[in-house]
Amino acid sequence: MARNDIRPIIKLKSTAGTGYTYVTRKNKRNNPDRITLKKYDPVARKHVEFREER
């Protein structure tokens, strides 16, 4: 199996509506659903939820 099949690169987009994104990798086997993480949005200047983009 190729490296990118199990752990693809995904974009996390801010739910604050600022358009800010983080780029990370995710393990599809352990987390098959869309992930949400609370991270810092420098445009909004606070911690907000970031959701996986497809």
From Swiss-Prot:
GO terms for molecular function: structural constituent of ribosome. One of its GO terms (biological process) is translation. GO terms for cellular component: cytosolic large ribosomal subunit. Keywords: Ribonucleoprotein, Ribosomal protein. Pfam families: Ribosomal_L33. The keyword Ribonucleoprotein applies. Gene3D superfamilies: Ribosomal protein L33. HAMAP family: Ribosomal_bL33. Belongs to the bacterial ribosomal protein bL33 family. NCBIfam families: PRK00595.1, rpmG_bact. PANTHER family: 54S RIBOSOMAL PROTEIN L39, MITOCHONDRIAL, LARGE RIBOSOMAL SUBUNIT PROTEIN BL33M. This is Large ribosomal subunit protein bL33. It comes from Corynebacterium urealyticum (strain ATCC 43042 / DSM 7109). The lineage of its organism: Bacteria, Bacillati, Actinomycetota, Actinomycetes, Mycobacteriales.
